[in-house]
């Protein structure tokens, strides 16, 4: 009987993990890449790669709503922040929740794309956060480069 109660409590605790991920991600480890293509073309390619990768766009906004940076002041007035929906990846005993913020900024002869990534892996009484995923971001940038015609 004690084993059944102990196992029941363990299962109950494992099911009570909640995750809070804000829509806006701070620049803990941003990835940036410059594409020698027009702003509209790069923005369309970025949205297409997001959709093809299984990400849903939560909303788009002006980045100055959240922060004012030298990059946004240097842009030619064309910049956008794309906020993704949380993406859940199921593991054996837990799930991982990831989110992206993507900035697209028009520069003089190019367009800069900045990706902020956050993954949260909750377990009972602890949450592990990661701000890096080099292979995912490099693949994402390569797909944008393929669509706009440069790397």
What are these regions (language model features)?
Residues 4-13:
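Sec-dependent N-terminal signal peptides
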Residues 17-151:
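Ser/Thr-rich, low-complexity intrinsically disordered terminal regions
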């Amino acid at each position: 009987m004690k084993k059944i109660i102990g196992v029941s409590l363990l299962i109950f605790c494992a099911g009570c993990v909640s995750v809070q991920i804000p829509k806006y991600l701070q620049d803990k480890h941003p990835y940036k890449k410059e594409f020698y293509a027009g702003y509209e073309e790069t923005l369309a390619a970025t949205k297409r790669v997001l959709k093809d990768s299984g990400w849903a766009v939560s909303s788009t906004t002006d980045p100055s709503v959240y922060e004012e940076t030298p990059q946004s002041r240097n842009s030619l007035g064309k910049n956008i922040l794309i906020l993704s929906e949380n993406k859940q990846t199921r593991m054996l005993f837990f799930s991982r929740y990831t989110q992206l913020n993507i900035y697209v900024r028009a520069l003089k002869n190019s367009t800069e794309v900045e990706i902020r990534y956050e993954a949260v892996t909750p377990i009972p009484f602890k949450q592990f956060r990661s701000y890096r995923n080099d292979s995912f971001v490099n693949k994402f940038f390569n797909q944008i480069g393929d669509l706009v015609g440069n790397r």
